[in-house]
Regions:
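A non-catalytic alpha/beta surface segment that caps or lines the substrate-entry region
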Residues: 23, 27-70
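Acidic/histidine-rich catalytic neighborhood of metal-dependent amide-processing enzymes
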Residues: 105-109, 113-191, 210
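Zn-dependent metallopeptidase/amidohydrolase metal-coordination segment
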Residues: 209-254
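Flexible, glycine/charged-enriched surface loops at secondary-structure junctions
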Residues: 52, 133-138, 205-211, 266-277
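N-terminal capping segment at the start of a domain
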Residues: 2-33, 240-241
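Active-site metal-coordination/substrate-binding segment of hydrolases
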Residues: 46-49, 64-65, 69-138, 148
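His/Asp/Glu-rich mid-to-C-terminal helical/loop segments that flank catalytic regions of hydrolases
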Residues: 238-290
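Positively charged, low-complexity terminal tracts
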Residues: 281-346
Length: 346
């Protein structure tokens, strides 16, 4: 969180932000069943009159906003929620914290990653509609599908569109102050950008810190597309569980931090800091054991399974034959993260 926030932001709920979040999180669209949220998001993007808007062959949504001369920044989040997200949830807010209920019991909220979707639209509202954020440059926006089952959407997206970017920001991290710059020994941003980001956070009075985190579409963008990337906290906790919740103040704080980044990223970019490939930094360690919880999409209601990778061995439990195609895709994404001479793949 920012250290010098005003008192009002701590005591008054941002109703506009709450309503925007509820608009997206209320839509039931788990992995493999994202038509409803895709239709809503595409319509909302189109209403902003972007210079370009399209869906790629997998169904990911992309848009471009030309905002004058300057650098090119890519903003992204994913549209799907985990496959076990319940239908007919009721979204409630109490004291600035948002929960989901189904039949009077706590349920998966889906802030992972509808909070990220909300953050991007709030930034676009400031830049394109209200014009209160004087960003100069080009904004590329992507909403990826099926991140929750192995970053499938981003791995099948329009690489050429994203590769126009000088830098990419993913909005898909739990907590309130993480700048994820790598995962499981794989860097998202180079050392120079990590140092600049950490210094910038301190200079502007924020508590955001460069850390190693979990898997997100930032992995695909950095390692498959070669773009220096980060993944920012957006204020959700206990994701993928019935105890999931979102802290609105923390989401709002991330939007403020991201807005300041957008106004200042031209500095490291013009200094050439993003020209170095995003493959090493001092934050991430060596590749380590990795476990992936595989969950089926909605149309395989009776299936579930676990893929675990420990001490160089892959174990697959409780999978039936109908999940093999999706399992293979998930394993391919995991395999790309590992060193072939360290892990024994079977």
């Amino acid at each position: 969180m920012k250290k010098n926030k005003d008192n009002q932001s701590q005591t008054k709920v941002n109703k506009e932000l709450l309503n925007a979040f509820k608009r997206y999180v209320s839509v039931y669209s788990p992995s493999g069943n994202t038509h409803k949220i895709s239709t809503l998001v595409f319509g909302d993007l189109a209403s902003l009159n972007p210079d370009n808007i399209f869906t790629d062959y997998y169904g990911n949504i992309h848009a471009q906003f030309n905002c004058g001369e300057g650098v090119t920044i890519h903003l992204n989040s994913h549209l799907d929620t985990v496959p076990r997200t319940q239908k007919n949830r009721t979204i409630k807010e109490l004291g600035g914290i948002v929960y989901a209920y189904q039949k009077n019991k706590r349920a998966i909220l889906g802030a992972d990653d509808r909070a990220g979707v909300t953050a991007i639209f709030e930034l676009l509202d400031q830049i394109v509609v209200k014009k209160t954020l004087p960003f100069k440059g080009t904004l590329l926006v992507s909403f990826f599908l099926d991140e929750e089952i192995g970053c499938v959407g981003s791995s099948k997206s329009d690489f050429e569109f994203v590769q126009q970017a000088d830098f990419s920001i993913t909005f898909d991290r739990k907590g309130n102050s993480d700048i994820v710059v790598g995962t499981y020994g794989v860097a998202f941003s180079n050392q120079s950008m990590c140092e600049w980001l950490q210094s910038f956070s301190i200079q502007k009075g924020y508590d955001f810190t460069c850390v190693e985190g979990g898997i997100s579409d930032a992995y695909t963008i950095s390692n498959d597309m070669g773009i220096n990337s980060i993944n920012l906290s957006v204020g959700y906790y206990n994701e993928h569980t019935d105890n999931e919740y979102l802290v609105l103040d923390e989401l709002e704080n991330t939007i403020k931090f991201a807005s300041e980044l957008l106004l200042n990223l031209h500095k490291p970019i013009n200094e050439g800091l993003t020209k170095e490939a995003p493959f090493t930094n001092s934050i991430v360690g060596k590749p380590k054991s990795y476990s992936y919880q595989f969950e089926p999409t909605a149309y395989y209601d009776n299936a579930n399974g676990v893929v675990s990778i420990t001490d160089g061995q892959v174990t697959i439990d409780c999978l039936n034959e109908f999940e093999i195609d999706k399992l293979i895709q998930s394993l391919k994404r995991a395999k790309e993260m590992m060193e072939d001479d360290y892990y024994n793949w079977k």
